């Protein structure tokens, strides 16, 4: 789209609209549906009762009894996202069950076939991803009330009490707090194209302010998520079957593929926010085999296609970093660095969160009730399949190196 042929404001609005980025909630799914048609009530009945079914040892039996339902009655993006979310929950619960060594290597065809059909329609993988459990897994208790933790809930739950509610909703609220930064991105690109230094400086400042607000929301994770419950219970259900010691060959989707497939579990790397800002600011992460850059590139396949395309759009936009350097303007350089420092600050806090919720619990002596793997295994892998501390340190360090010196 040639931004010069239309007003900057209209151009920015169209870019966001074209890439399914909402004015109010950013990359999150606006107004998710909460009910499936009656024909799909068997899925809903299981998905809404996972903790009880797992505790009673009935989960797998109930899943195996489910009828094979056609996805033809699921028309419209939001309805398909809700069904994909429900089947994602059921799949994770079926594979991991109580989180012990009793892991299923085959997903029955009555779930696998409709799940993979929906995945193909949506352009998402057949595993519970960030796009499902964070971006599409919410509702307001009072529809006319505010978008606050106290007025929100998730649609489905895993064992662990309110741990997943806290984890998913705080992650969602971080997305929403950062949405003004995403809304400012087309303005940044337009300002660079028009060589409008004042507009660019203001847009960069807006991004930095939004990141600071997102970090403040991120801090609430500690208010609502217990580290031991997250590590020993919830983390299991978010784990995927790529680089998995318990599913080294992946998961067989019966009736869909003849061989097992590997997919990563939900990861913050699947959020489009920070990848968008990296691309915008020209932050290049360490490349090579099994590198942060390779992992982040792979995580794009877990994003909704429109959001993935937004990253491609940004990669073809005028380079902001080079423009700022070429202007030799102190205020503009400070505004750029303000954005970079905002990203560094969020990433430093993310490191602290990983330390609290993964590293420290992993070093505690396991009790008989613990469901997690031995510490030697968990320390080297997060739910997305990477070593979370090594990955985040590298990403944070690379971000810091992007700061521009002045004069």
UniProtKB/Swiss-Prot annotation:
Ido1 and Ido2 are 2 distinct enzymes which catalyze the same reaction. Ido2 affinity for tryptophan is much lower than that of Ido1. Ido2 may play a role as a negative regulator of Ido1 by competing for heme-binding with Ido1. Low efficiency Ido2 enzymes have been conserved throughout vertebrate evolution, whereas higher efficiency Ido1 enzymes are dispensable in many lower vertebrate lineages. Ido1 may have arisen by gene duplication of a more ancient proto-IDO gene before the divergence of marsupial and eutherian (placental) mammals. Monomer. Residues 362-407 are annotated as: Disordered. The keyword Cell division does not apply. Disruption phenotype: Knockout mice display normal development and function of dendritic cells, on T- or B-cells development. They display increased sensitivity to the induction of inflammatory and autoimmune reactions. They produce litters of normal sizes at normal rates, implying that compensatory or redundant immunosuppressive mechanisms protected allogeneic fetuses during gestation in knockout mice. Knockout mice display cardiac and gastrointestinal liabilities. Transmembrane segments: none annotated. Its EC number is 1.13.11.52. This is Indoleamine 2,3-dioxygenase 1. PROSITE patterns: IDO_1, IDO_2. It comes from Mus musculus (Mouse). Binds 1 heme group per subunit. Belongs to the indoleamine 2,3-dioxygenase family. Highly expressed in epididymis, duodemum, jejunum, ileum, colon and spleen. Highly expressed in epididymis, prostate, duodemum, jejunum, ileum, colon and spleen, not detected in the liver (at protein level). Expressed in tumors only upon exposure to IFN gamma. Constitutively expressed in placenta in trophoblast cells. Expression is restricted to perinuclear regions of primary trophoblast giant cells (TGCs) of fetal origin at mid-gestation (10.5 dpc). After placentation (14 dpc), no IDO expression was detected at the maternal-fetal interface. InterPro entries: Indolamine_dOase, Trp/Indoleamine_2_3_dOase-like. GO terms for cellular component: cytoplasm; cytosol; smooth muscle contractile fiber; stereocilium bundle. One of its GO terms (molecular function) is metal ion binding. Activity is inhibited by and MTH-trp (methylthiohydantoin-DL-tryptophan), modestly inhibited by L-1MT (1-methyl-L-tryptophan) but not D-1MT (1-methyl-D-tryptophan). Its cofactor is heme b.
């Amino acid at each position: 789209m040639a931004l010069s042929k239309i007003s900057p404001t209209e151009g920015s609005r169209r870019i966001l609209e074209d890439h399914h980025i909402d004015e109010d909630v950013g990359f999150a799914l606006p107004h998710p549906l909460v009910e499936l048609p009656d024909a799909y009530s068997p899925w809903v009945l299981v998905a809404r009762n996972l903790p009880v079914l797992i505790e009673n040892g009935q989960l797998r039996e109930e899943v195996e009894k489910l009828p094979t339902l056609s996805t033809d009655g699921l028309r419209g993006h939001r309805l398909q996202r809700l069904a994909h979310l429900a089947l994602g929950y059921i799949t994770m619960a079926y594979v991991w069950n109580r989180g012990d060594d009793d892991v299923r290597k085959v997903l029955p065809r009555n779930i696998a076939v409709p799940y993979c059909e929906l995945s193909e329609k949506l352009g998402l993988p057949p595993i519970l991803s960030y796009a499902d459990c964070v971006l599409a897994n919410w509702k307001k208790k009072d529809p006319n009330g505010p978008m606050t933790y106290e007025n929100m809930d998730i649609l489905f739950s895993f064992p662990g009490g309110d741990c997943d509610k806290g984890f998913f909703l705080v992650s969602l609220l971080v997305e929403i707090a950062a949405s003004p930064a995403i809304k400012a991105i087309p303005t940044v690109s337009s300002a660079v194209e028009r060589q409008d230094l004042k507009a660019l400086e203001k847009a960069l400042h807006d991004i930095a302010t939004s990141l600071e607000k997102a970090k403040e929301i991120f801090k609430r994770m500690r208010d609502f998520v217990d580290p031991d419950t997250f590590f020993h219970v919830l983390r299991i259900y978010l784990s995927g079957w790529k680089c998995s010691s318990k599913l080294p060959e992946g998961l067989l989707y019966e009736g869909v593929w003849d061989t097992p497939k590997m997919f990563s579990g939900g990861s913050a790397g699947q959020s489009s926010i920070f990848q968008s800002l990296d691309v915008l600011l020209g932050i290049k992460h360490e490349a090579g085999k099994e590198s942060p850059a390779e992992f982040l590139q792979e995580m794009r396949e877990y994003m909704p296609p429109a959001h993935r395309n937004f990253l491609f759009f940004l990669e073809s936009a005028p380079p902001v970093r080079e423009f700022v350097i070429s202007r030799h303007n102190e205020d503009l350089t400070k505004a750029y660095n303000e954005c970079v420092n905002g990203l560094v600050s969020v990433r430093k806090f993310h490191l602290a969160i990983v330390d609290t919720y993964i590293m420290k619990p992993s070093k505690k002596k396991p009790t008989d009730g613990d469901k997690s793997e031995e510490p030697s295994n968990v320390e080297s892998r997060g739910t997305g399949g990477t070593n979370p501390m090594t990955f985040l340190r590298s990403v944070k360090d690379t971000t810091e190196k992007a700061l521009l010196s002045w004069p």
